[in-house]
Amino acid sequence: MELLKEQIREVARVEKGNVLKVDSFLNHQLDIPLLNEIGKELKKRFQGEKVDKILTAEVSGIAIAAIAAQYFNVPVVFAKKTQSKNLDQDTYEGEVYSYTKGQAYKIRVSKRYLHEKENILIIDDFLANGEALQGLREIVVQANANLVGAGIVIEKGFQGGGKRLRAENMRIESLAIIDEMNESTLVFRDDKADLKADPKAS
């Protein structure tokens, strides 16, 4: 998606540890016009597929999923990372390992909101090692629902999660795939051009 790639080139920052900072438009401050275009593009990528619900994980996936859901005209269900009193005790659970935190945690969805044979589309902001996507898939499997696929805004192709999950026959549509990155360069899979970061953005 060219508009998304241009935004990444112009304002994203790459920090140590393969951290891509897109908090100015995607996961802290939100660029709503851009998110609308992302929603339209995800709808186009899954055109013709029957989707009953969109599933994502809190927190960063919620805004993207909610805006995309307008174009699919379906509800959004988000997996919660904490066990709280206002979450039903009867839940589906997936396990996610966080490489940044160095620990595993559970994500949960009430059984009220995912049902057998429903067609579920997963939407999330990032795909790196694939742990979050795998945890969300576990929840879909437990619900005996049908996984339509996953719509991802940014995939770090060099971290291998997308390759592994595609090899397991999961359909993944990533709007921007980064195959190489460092503090001065980003290389997108579909153009393989060295894209020098704007020094003003750092």
Curated annotation (Swiss-Prot):
**Which Pfam family is one of this chain's hits?**
Pribosyltran
Annotated xanthine binding lies at L20, N27, K156
Cellular localisation: Cytoplasm
Q: Which pathway?
A: Purine metabolism; XMP biosynthesis via salvage pathway; XMP from xanthine: step 1/1
> Is Transferase set as a keyword in this record?
yes
Which EC number(s) are documented for this chain? 2.4.2.22
Q: Which family does it belong to?
A: Belongs to the purine/pyrimidine phosphoribosyltransferase family. Xpt subfamily.
Which HAMAP family does UniProt cross-reference here?
A: XPRTase (MF_01184)
Q: What does this protein do?
A: Converts the preformed base xanthine, a product of nucleic acid breakdown, to xanthosine 5'-monophosphate (XMP), so it can be reused for RNA or DNA synthesis.
Subunit structure, interactors included: Homodimer.
PANTHER family noted in UniProt: HYPOXANTHINE/GUANINE PHOSPHORIBOSYLTRANSFERASE, XANTHINE PHOSPHORIBOSYLTRANSFERASE
| Name recorded for this polypeptide | Xanthine phosphoribosyltransferase
